[in-house]
Amino acid sequence: MEIKNKKVVVTGAASGIGKELCIAFKSHGAASICAVDVNLDGAQETAQQISGMSLFADVSKEEDIKNVIEKTTKEFGGIDIFCSNAGIGGLPGFFESETADWQKIWEINVQAHIHAAKHVLPQMLDRGEGYLVNTSSAAGLLTQLGASSYAVTKAAAVSF
């Protein structure tokens, strides 16, 4: 994948893998990078570090993802690479968890990928190029004791 002069969006960019992706894209010559996170202060810090743009988004909400795509498309003139990276873990174990716990992790770790695809792929298909990168985990391939909700969502992300 050629990075130089590409317009990039990364969700979950306030810390961890998302922040490091932004830094890596910048170091490989990306033209424009938008750091997206529910933690806007963290996204702004990342954006400052890479001379990029930052936006707030709760990726569990389709409307937030749609707005990010619309705003960055308008600002950058399109999106070449969309990294759907935001994710959560650390929820209660199977017997301790509630339906709301499962719904929350599903919306963030799976639905966010689906919403991103729905709203960013049309412009990429129209241009005949672009990359949608969905972050998952080895937990989606291996059983993890005490992490069933996380593992299930990561397996779904691998399959999507």
Residue ranges and their predicted role:
Residues 93-106:
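Substrate-binding pocket helix/loop in short-chain dehydrogenase/reductase
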